[in-house]
Swiss-Prot record:
Its EC number is 1.1.3.50. It comes from Microbacterium trichothecenolyticum (Aureobacterium trichothecenolyticum). It comes from the Bacteria. FAD-dependent C-glycoside-metabolizing enzyme that participates in the degradation of certain C-glycosides by catalyzing the oxidation of the hydroxyl group at the C3 position of the sugar moiety. Shows oxidase activity toward C-glycosides such as isoorientin and mangiferin but cannot use carminic acid, puerarin, orientin or aloesin. Shows weak activity (100 to 1000-fold lower) with O-glycosides. Probably plays a crucial role in the metabolism of C-glycosides in nature. Residues 62-82 have a biased composition (Basic and acidic residues). This is C-glycoside 3-oxidase.
Length: 515
C-alpha cells in the first residue's frame, strides 16, 4: 500500500469530519479562501460525496455495507453484526455506530450503558435523524443572547445544514397528528412554543425522493471545490502539538500503514465528538479543570400508538404506500422550562411491539413518540481517561462517571406520564407503559469541553471556542454546549462552531492585510 502524503504545514488542521468540523472548513472556505486546511478523519469514506447521509444510498446492501464500515476499529465487512437498540437489557448499537466496550458504568453509578460512536467521514451525521430544533428557555446560552448573537448564529447553522420545515407537507396525516397534539398541549404555551413541524436537515428533490443532509451538505460545493482544502480519511490524530504554550499542529497516524507524521498548523480545531475531543486533549497533556466534566446525555422515553381513524393511502393499483415518516411527517413539541422535555413524533417503519399475527398494522398507522429530558448538570458527571490503558485506537481508555440525580428521576417520571397523555391524544397505545431507553441511547452527549465567559475552572473554552490557556487550539461539536438541553443539539453545536470559525477567519485575513 502506498504511503499517504500529508502536508508538512497548513494554516488550519481540523480533527473530525462531522457537522462541526465541516462548519469550520466551510466558513474558512467562504471567508478566508487562501487559508490551507487539512481535515483528518479516523474512519473511512462510506458515501459519495464524502460525508453524505447513508439514507441517500438507494441500494439496501450498499447502505448496510456503509453502516458496517462506520463501526469503529473492529468494524466488520460482512453481515455478522447486531444492530438496533431493542426493548431488552442487552447492550446493542444502532447500525452505523459502535459501543464503548468498557468503562461505560462505574460501580454504584448509572453510567451510560449504550454510549456509542461512529467512525466515518461525516461522523454521526451520516446516520442521524436530521432533527434541528432551536433551543428554548434555559437551553439557550445566556451570554450569547445578551450580545444578540445566538439567533443569528442559529440561522447560519440552519443555512449550512440545509434545514427545512416543509419536506413532509404532502404527508397525508401530518396535519392530523399536529391537530390532535395541539388540542391537548397548546393552550398553555406561547405561540412559538406550540406544537409544530419539526425543523429537519432534509429536502425533497423535484422528482420526489428525500435527500438527508450530512456533512457533505455543510461542506458544500465551495469547500469541495476549494483547492486549499484536503480531507484525509483513515487518519488518526493522536496528539495536538504545543510549543511555547500555543497550539502548533498535530501528530497523525495513517491507519492503513501505521506511519506517523507531524503536521504543523497555525490553528488546530478538535471536533472529534463529545467523548473523543476531551480524549485527544488529555492525550496531548492539555487538561483544564473542566475537561470531560459536566457530561450530559438526554434520558429518552418512547411510546407507540396506533392512529385512530386511519385509512392507508393506496396507489393506482390499490396497494398501500409507505415509507419512513411519509404518512405522518415529523412533529415537534418544543422544550419549555415548565415542560422540561423535547418531543419528537413520527411514523414508525414498524411497530416496536410485536402485534398479533391476525392483527397486522396498516402501513403508516403506528406512530412513535419520544420525549428527551434535560439533565441536571453535575461536575461529577464526567469522562475520565487512563494514563495506562488504551482503547481500540490506542488512545487513552475512557471511564464514564454518570449518575441521575433526584431531580433527573423526577423529570423522567413526569415525562413518562406526559408521553402517555400525548400518545392517547393521537391514538390507541400499543403498550400500557412507556419505555425508558438505556442511558446513552440519545447519542446527544454534551458539555465535556463546555464554553464559558471566563477561565474559572467551570469551562474549557471561551465564547470563540478557543481553549483556555492554549491559544490557537479550538474545540467544536456538541461537547461545547454549556447548557442542559433536551432538544437535538446538532444545530446549536454547529452555531457555536460558526462563531469559532469566524474568529479564525478574521485572524487569518487580518494577518494577510497587514503584510
Amino acid at each position: 500500500m502506498s504511503t499517504r502524503v500529508y502536508p508538512a504545514q497548513v494554516d488550519v488542521a481540523i480533527v473530525g469530519s462531522g457537522p462541526a468540523g465541516a462548519t469550520y472548513a466551510r466558513i474558512l472556505s467562504e471567508r478566508a479562501s487562501s487559508a490551507t486546511i487539512a481535515m483528518f478523519e479516523v474512519g473511512p469514506t462510506v458515501s459519495d460525496p464524502p460525508g453524505a447521509h447513508v439514507k441517500n444510498i438507494a441500494d439496501a446492501d450498499e447502505r448496510a455495507h456503509a453502516q458496517r464500515r462506520s463501526e469503529g476499529p473492529h468494524a466488520r465487512e460482512d453481515d455478522d453484526r447486531v444492530g438496533g437498540i431493542v426493548k431488552s437489557a442487552q447492550r446493542r448499537a444502532r447500525p452505523g455506530t459502535y459501543l464503548l466496550e468498557s468503562g461505560y458504568q462505574a460501580d454504584g453509578e448509572d453510567g451510560l450503558p449504550v454510549a456509542a460512536f461512529s467512525s466515518n467521514v461525516g461522523g454521526m451525521a451520516a446516520h442521524w435523524t436530521g432533527a434541528c430544533p432551536r433551543p428554548n428557555d434555559s437551553e439557550r446560552i445566556g451570554f450569547l443572547d445578551e450580545t444578540g448573537e445566538l439567533d443569528e448564529l442559529l440561522s447560519e447553522g440552519e443555512r449550512l445544514l440545509g434545514v427545512t420545515t416543509d419536506a413532509f407537507d404532502a404527508s397525508p396525516y401530518a396535519g392530523i397528528v399536529r391537530e390532535r397534539l395541539a388540542a391537548v398541549e397548546d393552550a398553555h404555551r406561547d405561540a412559538d412554543e406550540r406544537v409544530q413541524r419539526m425543523p429537519l436537515a432534509v429536502h425533497r428533490r423535484d422528482d420526489g425522493p428525500l435527500v438527508w443532509s450530512g456533512s457533505d451538505v455543510v461542506l458544500g460545493d465551495i469547500t469541495r471545490g476549494n483547492p486549499n482544502f484536503t480531507l484525509f480519511d483513515e487518519s488518526l490524530v493522536t496528539r495536538v502539538l504545543v510549543e511555547d504554550g500555543r497550539a502548533a499542529g498535530v501528530v497523525v497516524t495513517d491507519v492503513r500503514t501505521g506511519e506517523r507524521r507531524d503536521v504543523r498548523a497555525r490553528f488546530v480545531v478538535v471536533a472529534a465528538d463529545a467523548l473523543r475531543t476531551p480524549q485527544l486533549l488529555w492525550a496531548s497533556g492539555i487538561r483544564p479543570d473542566a475537561l470531560g466534566r459536566y457530561l450530559n446525555d438526554q434520558a429518552q422515553i418512547v411510546f407507540a400508538v396506533r392512529m385512530r381513524d386511519f385509512t392507508p393511502v393506496v396507489d393506482a393499483d390499490g396497494v398501500p404506500q409507505t415509507g419512513l415518516s411519509e404518512y405522518t411527517g415529523v412533529t415537534w413539541v418544543p422544550f419549555t422550562d415548565d415542560m422540561p422535555f423535547h418531543g419528537q413524533v413520527m411514523q414508525l417503519d414498524a411497530s416496536p411491539v410485536k402485534l398479533a399475527d391476525d392483527d397486522p398494522a396498516a402501513p403508516g398507522s403506528i406512530v412513535g413518540l419520544g420525549l428527551f429530558c434535560a439533565k441536571d448538570l453535575q461536575a461529577s458527571d464526567r469522562v475520565a481517561f487512563s494514563d495506562s490503558d488504551v482503547d481500540g485506537y490506542g488512545m487513552p481508555a475512557m471511564q464514564l462517571h454518570y449518575t441521575l440525580s433526584d431531580r433527573d428521576h423526577a423529570t423522567i417520571d413526569r415525562a413518562k406520564a406526559e408521553i402517555v397523555r400525548l400518545g392517547k391524544a393521537i391514538g390507541d397505545p400499543l403498550d400500557d407503559r412507556p419505555f425508558v431507553m438505556p442511558l446513552g441511547a440519545s447519542l446527544h452527549y454534551q458539555g465535556t469541553v463546555r464554553m464559558g465567559l471566563a477561565d474559572d475552572g467551570a469551562s474549557v473554552c471561551s465564547p470563540d471556542s478557543e481553549v483556555w490557556g492554549a491559544p490557537g487550539l479550538f474545540v467544536a461539536g456538541n461537547g461545547v454546549i454549556p447548557t442542559a438541553t433536551a432538544c437535538n443539539p446538532t444545530l446549536t453545536g454547529v452555531a457555536l462552531a460558526v462563531r469559532g470559525a469566524r474568529h479564525i477567519a478574521d485572524e487569518i485575513t487580518a494577518d494577510l492585510a497587514s503584510v
